[in-house]
Design a protein with these regions (language model features):
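Short polybasic amphipathic segments
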Residues: 34, 56-61, 80, 96-104
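Mature extracytoplasmic domains of secretory-pathway proteins
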Residues: 45-81
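C-terminal motif of bacterial Sec signal peptides marking the signal peptidase cleavage site
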Residues: 16-19
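C-terminal partner/receptor-binding element of secreted or periplasmic proteins
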Residues: 93-118
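Broad, structure-driven detector of short, well-ordered beta-strand segments within folded domains
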Residues: 44-50, 87-93
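Bacterial signal peptide processing site
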Residues: 21-23
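Bacterial N-terminal signal peptides that target proteins for export
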Residues: 1-9
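Tryptophan-anchored aromatic micro-motifs
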Residues: 30-44, 82
Length: 118
């Protein structure tokens, strides 16, 4: 009897695993570079991405100093906000945005301001 229960449990587990594999395959969409001209002639580049089911949006932020950040979209009252909550934030609304970075004391400081889409 114990052997029958084991075989039934094994068959059930295989059925569940097979069912998990038949879900929709996700892909990443977007990625075209968008350039922004900021104060003092600095340029930042943002690539906007999302999963094909739109469950996640994120960006690749490239700064003039050569640093790159991959930032998921976060809750925002107005416009869009992308942040890792540790080092960088990209805020944008319409054709404009700005970048905040943490300083040595852990405080957010605006690093690139008044950035306008080119």
């Amino acid at each position: 009897m114990n052997k029958v229960h084991m075989m039934t449990a094994g068959a059930l587990a295989l059925g569940l695993l097979a069912g998990c594999n038949q879900g929709n395959t996700l892909s990443v969409t977007g990625g075209e570079p968008v350039s922004y001209q900021c104060e003092q002639g600095k340029k930042v580049q943002v690539r906007y991405f999302s999963l094909s089911d739109e469950s996640l949006s994120f960006i690749k932020l490239s700064l003039p100093d050569g640093k790159d950040y991959t930032l998921p979209q976060a809750v925002s009252a107005s416009g869009a906000r992308y942040t890792d909550e540790h080092e960088a934030v990209w805020w944008n609304k319409g054709d404009e945005g700005f970048v905040e970075l943490r300083d040595q004391d852990g405080e957010w400081q605006t690093a690139y301001n008044d950035c306008k889409q080119q």
